[in-house]
Swiss-Prot record:
PANTHER family assigned: CYTOCHROME B (PTHR19271:SF16)
Molecular function via GO: metal ion binding; ubiquinol-cytochrome-c reductase activity
Membrane-traversing stretches: 33-53, 77-98, 113-133, 178-198, 226-246, 288-308, 320-340, 347-367
Keywords: Electron transport, Heme, Iron, Membrane, Metal-binding, Mitochondrion, Mitochondrion inner membrane, Respiratory chain, Transmembrane, Transmembrane helix, Transport, Ubiquinone
Designated name of the protein: Cytochrome b
Details of cofactor binding: Binds 2 heme b groups non-covalently.
Similarity field: Belongs to the cytochrome b family.
Binding site for a ubiquinone: 201
Length: 382
């Protein structure tokens, strides 16, 4: 009798993707974040579904409905806290996943990389519209400030902003449509994840050395299933510790106050995972320039494959590129810190220097380092 796993049309796809998939034998824990992101997405969709059952997307009752979920719904507080902190885990895994891709040259699988960047943008959009839903002060003012950025677009800007608002300010129409977007986008993300995996399985995974791994492959199951489960358990433990012991650690205290259009919070800032981009936005005095820099801070990832000058794929054996990579990491941490600070000196100038160095490292220094390393590796015999 033939094995159903290998003959059934549907089981065969699952088998070729998660069971008999040939994998490089030497991929490290940095390759765990793909499966962790998949799990984050599933957790977010499930908790979000249960929250949507009790949430009302009306300006008068949205804030109260969230309070009702936490007080009156069975384990509603837990579902809400897992959903809110799950977003933080999602972005933490995303940043590490993208960082791994840059360090080990995974961006050379261009199709996988490009759909990954589009995925990152879609997840960011989903998180933004989701943050508006509790209808607290920071939800309202965050929505007002960020949607207002579109007014910087010449000629059509103001019309576009009012079209997105569904009126002349952020109001009931805005909240309702943001809820609709927040509900539909995760399913679009899910479809894009399938495409992301489809492109990845065309080429197979890269590995820490950057060398061709074809000569040494092992099956995904049981080796990497058990490894992924270990990573998953660790992530769930961290998520539950965060959600149960300090659920408001990463949130903004202003969001415990219901939205009030007549009262502006002293410091309008997004969640921690957007602070680096927010710092880049604020570091440019011109509105349109700031918006373009904000977009470029993410879209610059799309040109990274074109800027690869090294003869080696991975940074594992490239000390100069490694130094630049960790400088970039430190730079992003500085930008994240600056994004949460008020707009005053010395934060303004630090933010401006950090923004300049962010783009300089990626666009200029990394390609130059690759060329320098190529030159240093050439034999210099007379």
């Amino acid at each position: 009798m033939t094995n159903l796993r290998k003959t059934h049309p549907l089981m065969k796809i699952i088998n070729d993707s998660f069971i008999d998939l040939p994998m490089p034998s030497n991929i490290s824990a940095w390759w765990n974040f793909g499966s962790l992101l998949g799990m984050c997405l599933i957790i977010q969709i499930l908790t979000g579904l249960f929250l949507a059952m009790h949430y009302t997307s009306d300006t008068l009752t949205a804030f109260s409905s969230v309070a009702h979920i936490c007080r009156d719904v069975n384990y509603g507080w837990l579902i809400r806290n897992i959903h809110a902190n799950g977003a933080s885990m999602f972005f933490m895994c995303l940043f590490l996943h993208v960082g791994r891709g840059i360090y080990y040259g995974s961006y050379l699988y261009k199709e996988t990389w490009n759909i990954g960047v589009i995925l990152l943008l879609t997840v960011m959009a989903t998180a933004f519209v989701g943050y508006v839903l509790p209808w607290g002060q920071m939800s309202f003012w965050g929505a007002t400030v960020i949607t207002n950025l579109l007014s910087a677009i010449p000629y059509i800007g103001n019309t576009l902003v009012e079209w997105i608002w569904g009126g002349f300010s952020v109001d009931k129409a805005t909240l309702t449509r943001f809820f609709a977007f927040h509900f539909i986008l995760p399913f679009i993300i899910l479809a894009m994840v399938v495409v992301h995996l489809l492109f990845l399985h065309e080429t197979g995974s890269s590995n820490p050395t950057g060398l061709n791994p074809d000569s040494d492959k092992i099956p995904f199951h049981p080796y990497y299933t058990i490894k992924d489960i270990l990573g998953l358990f660790l992530m769930i433990i961290i998520l539950l510790l965060l959600a149960m012991f300090s659920p408001d650690l990463l949130g903004d205290p202003d969001n415990f106050t219901p939205a009030n259009p007549l009262n502006t919070p002293p410091h309008i800032k997004p969640e921690w995972y957007f602070l680096f981009a927010y710092a880049i936005l604020r570091s440019i005095p011109n509105k349109l320039g700031g918006v373009l820099a904000l977009l470029m801070s993410i879209l610059v990832l799309l040109i990274i494959p074109l800027l690869h000058t090294s003869t080696q794929r991975s940074m594992a054996f490239r000390p100069i590129s490694q130094t630049l990579f960790w400088m970039l990491t430190a730079n992003l941490i500085i930008l994240t810190w600056i994004g949460g600070q008020p707009v005053e000196q010395p934060y303004i100038i630090i933010g401006q220097w950090a923004s300049i160095s962010y783009f300089t490292i990626i666009i200029i220094l990394m390609p130059l380092a690759g060329m320098l390393e190529n030159y240093m590796l050439k034999p210099k015999f007379p």
